[in-house]
């Protein structure tokens, strides 16, 4: 996961990249005073690692401390619109990003470009299987905050934080797809 604050401060660009499956998508989290929207997105996807621009303040980083996600600082230019757009268009062999639906979202492009560049620099294998970038709108799905996810025991049990007695583990035992 990569997070890129919008220059005007109205939203955060969020990119999620799974290098094992090639799934790659971006979304936006509207800015709010306590970062609840952003923290809900982090709780929703539970990434192993989250990269952020190196200039993000320590006060802001402290807000992420309860998420359990490893935060890694990455150089600021990777998140810039121009650099990120070049990284993405080069990787996808495309002249523009309009086909991906995110051309007009600089924060989303910044996050996606930084995530892809970070993967290119840290992985010793080809990333050719990452063949598309999807754009997801938060308004197209129901959002459950971290407290609701915990109380419903979707991915983690309330008793000890184990993964054994959860909705996800029960569905994982089914023999047929739903």
Residue ranges and their predicted role:
Residues 1-178:
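Charged catalytic and DNA/RNA-contacting regions of genome-maintenance
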């Amino acid at each position: 996961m990569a997070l890129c604050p919008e220059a005007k401060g109205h939203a955060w660009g969020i990119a999620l990249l799974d290098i094992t499956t090639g799934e790659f998508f971006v979304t936006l989290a509207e800015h709010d005073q306590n970062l609840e929207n952003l923290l809900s997105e982090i709780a929703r996807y539970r990434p192993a690692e989250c990269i952020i621009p190196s200039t993000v303040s320590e006060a802001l980083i402290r807000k992420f401390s309860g998420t359990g996600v490893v935060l890694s600082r990455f150089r600021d230019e990777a998140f810039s619109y121009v650099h990120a757009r070049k990284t993405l268009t080069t990787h996808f062999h495309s002249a523009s990003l309009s086909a991906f639906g995110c051309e007009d979202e600089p924060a989303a492009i910044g996050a996606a470009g930084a995530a892809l560049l970070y993967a290119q620099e840290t992985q010793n294998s080809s990333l050719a299987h990452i063949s598309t970038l999807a754009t997801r709108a938060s308004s197209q799905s129901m959002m459950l905050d971290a407290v609701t996810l915990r109380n419903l025991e979707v991915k983690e049990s309330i008793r000890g934080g184990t993964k054994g007695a959860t909705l996800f583990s029960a569905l994982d035992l089914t023999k047929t797809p739903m």
